[in-house]
């Protein structure tokens, strides 16, 4: 069995601890926009439309359809407080660390971890490099909860309705368009819970 474990599978544990998994802090690297013909892709002379999914639960503000125009790479999700509150500490643990670019290694998807939100999260998997792992590992010295097992660096491109045919068609197109593309890092993003 190769199922991705998630803290969301143990929701009652975190409720008992008084921890809202949707309100944890996050440090991200903003990247240049991912330019793609997202909404219309011609395939065999047929225009395919990819319906966006936007969160029903407004606490999940980040689930907002096409997000490739304002992309980020999560360096660490799960701080016990908003990353802005840890800014001085983050600057200390990341002192001397810098990334200028990342490379798209593949295109894939994640299933929604929320039973009440049925969508696919279409992502650009990022090539894992020593410098990227170092940044992530430095941040792990700060108080946090791992909400998923292992670090899977990715940039979210879009949240789409849960339809396997649409998902697979979109992924096939994006692979041909984006794999191997380098994305410029625009800076740190300390996030925030709207």
Predicted regions and their residues:
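Histidine-dependent nucleotide/RNA phosphoesterase domain, centered on the 2H-phosphoesterase fold
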Residues: 2-194
């Amino acid at each position: 069995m190769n199922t991705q474990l998630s803290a969301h599978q143990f929701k009652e544990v975190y409720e008992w601890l008084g921890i809202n998994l949707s309100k944890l802090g996050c440090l991200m690297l903003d990247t240049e926009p991912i330019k793609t013909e997202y909404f219309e892709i011609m395939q065999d002379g047929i225009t395919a439309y990819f319906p966006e999914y936007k969160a029903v639960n407004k606490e999940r503000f980040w689930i907002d359809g096409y997000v490739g125009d304002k992309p980020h790479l999560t360096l660490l999700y799960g701080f016990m407080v908003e990353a802005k509150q840890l800014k001085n500490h983050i600057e200390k643990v990341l002192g001397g660390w810098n990334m200028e670019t990342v490379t798209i290694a593949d295109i894939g998807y994640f299933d929604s971890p929320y039973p009440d939100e049925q969508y696919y999260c279409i992502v650009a998997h990022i090539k894992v490099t020593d410098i990227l792992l170092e940044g992530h590992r430095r941040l792990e010295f700060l108080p946090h909860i791992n909400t998923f097992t292992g670090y899977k660096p990715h940039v979210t491109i879009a949240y789409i309705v849960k339809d396997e045919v649409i998902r697979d068609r979109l992924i096939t197109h994006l692979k041909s368009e984006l794999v191997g593309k380098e994305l410029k890092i625009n800076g740190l993003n300390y996030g925030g819970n709207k």
